[in-house]
Amino acid sequence: MSALNSRTVEEVRKDYAKLLDPQEPLDSRMRELYRLKEDCLKTAAGVTVILETIDTTDSVLLQHELAYNAGQSGREEAVPELERILRTTSYDVVTRHEAAEALGAIGSPLALQVLEAHSDPTTEPEAPIRETCELALARIAMKETKGDAAVAPPSGCEFVSVDPSPAFSALYSSTDEPVPHTVEELEAVLLDTSGRTRLFRRYMAMFTLRNLATEAAVAALCRGLREDNVSALFRHEVAFVLGQLERPSSQPALIAALKDEEEAPMVRHEAAEALGAIADPATLPVLESYATHHEPIVRDSCVVALEMHKYWANFNGLAHQQQQEA
């Protein structure tokens, strides 16, 4: 075992005291989380400190990022605490949703009971949480029946996140559901809000389009963001995927989602973060104008997006300077 992976919880707490400090500004704590993610996310001590941080903040944005990264760790030790968060209705819906998604990402059968309970409309009133649990159950079932490879990113894929569903692949087959291949076929699945297409299958189309990463695929995803009218959870994931792709052509759809006062906050927040990831100076005015928004997760996401803008502007400026000096 490396020295890095053998650090104790106490050592990681000391190294990430700013992350655990409720008095630290949000942007500072977010930077510390990203640093921990690169440093020791997949260790028992790392995920313990991530989970301990959740109850040190009332920022839904930070809570949601912490729960997301707990899921990305793949550590089964995180399951009991994530289950507690999912069950606790005093947490914001976005935080609870992210705990459920994290349970699906970890993929442990230990979580099946709580996921089944919160996928039931008779016990869980919040649609985004029910839908997240539905996706998590489907992902765990696919992992159990088809193996780890069925839910893993394709070989050579640039996107290494553990997603709520896999993309379509040769490992996915069904006599009832043919595998879509073209952008047009994938878009038809993505945009099917009739109820005939399971949400998990729509997600599979989404991640397949992301992996294709063509302009036509991006355009289809933008349509999904703005044309879907049945699932805020789905639209928020499309915005996240567009942030991963970082294509300027997606900015009009993302800006429209951020500005839409009728849109769910969870969607608007992901749209803001996606704009931050793209880091086009042209979007600075809209992010600045929503950085004082009355909805906390929208406001905080715009603040973080502006920090991302600043980082990439400095990074690109340094790279340009080095090219000039070479």
From Swiss-Prot:
Biological or metabolic pathway of the protein: Protein modification; eIF5A hypusination
Mechanisms controlling activity: Inhibited by metal chelators ciclopirox olamine and mimosine, both of which also significantly inhibit growth. Kojic acid has no effect on activity.
Residues bound to Fe cation 2: 97-98, 236
Membrane-spanning intervals of the chain: none
GO MF terms, alphabetically ordered: deoxyhypusine monooxygenase activity; iron ion binding
GO biological process, one term: peptidyl-lysine modification to peptidyl-hypusine
Residues annotated to bind Fe cation 1: 64, 269-270
Co-factor requirement: Fe(2+)
HEAT-like PBS-type repeat feature ranges: 62-88, 95-124, 201-227, 234-260, 267-293
SUPFAM superfamilies: ARM repeat (SSF48371)
Substrates-to-products reaction catalysed: [eIF5A protein]-deoxyhypusine + AH2 + O2 = [eIF5A protein]-hypusine + A + H2O
Textual note on the cofactor: Binds 2 Fe(2+) ions per subunit.
UniProt key word Acyltransferase: no
Function as written in the Swiss-Prot or TrEMBL entry: Catalyzes the hydroxylation of the N(6)-(4-aminobutyl)-L-lysine intermediate produced by deoxyhypusine synthase/DHPS on a critical lysine of the eukaryotic translation initiation factor 5A/eIF-5A. This is the second step of the post-translational modification of that lysine into an unusual amino acid residue named hypusine. Hypusination is unique to mature eIF-5A factor and is essential for its function.
Similarity comment: family membership: Belongs to the deoxyhypusine hydroxylase family.
Protein name: Deoxyhypusine hydroxylase
Species whose genome carries this gene: Leishmania donovani
Lineage: Eukaryota, Discoba, Euglenozoa, Kinetoplastea, Metakinetoplastina
